[in-house]
Amino acid sequence: SQKLRINFNGIGPYEFCPVVRRSPALERRGLEVLERLHTWAADPANAGLVDRVLNWAYLSETRDSYAIENETPAPDKERAFLQAMEQLRDRRPLSEDYLVDLQNLVITSAIKQELAFRHEQNWLQRGGHGALAVRYLPPPPAQVGELMDGLMRLANAREGDVPPLVKAALVSFGFVFVHPFMDGNGRLSRLLAQHSLSLQG
């Protein structure tokens, strides 16, 4: 703000500005892991293995993602999730339309597929009924658009000094925090971590 002579140095825009406690040890470790992966993938001796490892990782991520939701995916759901993961290679910037497309891919039930971000309140609950069963109440629908605009601006920004693994975690967690759809948010959040890493190279 020029009026107040304050330099905003937050992670992300005002609409979505998470706070992260930085640790030199954690940052160092994250960079080491990324460097080792990059070195391995760039080695010509591993050229034939890269595709095999990616295919294994995609299949493993698909099954694990459904296991987190306590589901065993039917073959059509497995194929849909794999297709969504393969779309991440396109490195498209996040937008509401793109997220709706991804949600429609991972949610195979036409009744639960979305056309836009939610316009009603949702919540997560464990077994039981009533308010005591609610374990998370996402932001109200009136705030979803602004929060998602901020989150998408953070996700799409290619510059900045946020380490890639930290940014991927922020995008993934932020998506679950906002919970912009009535269904599929958990699966999409796991896809968005990978999307964030692919955008950052």
What are these regions (language model features)?
Residues 1-201:
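FIC/Doc superfamily catalytic core
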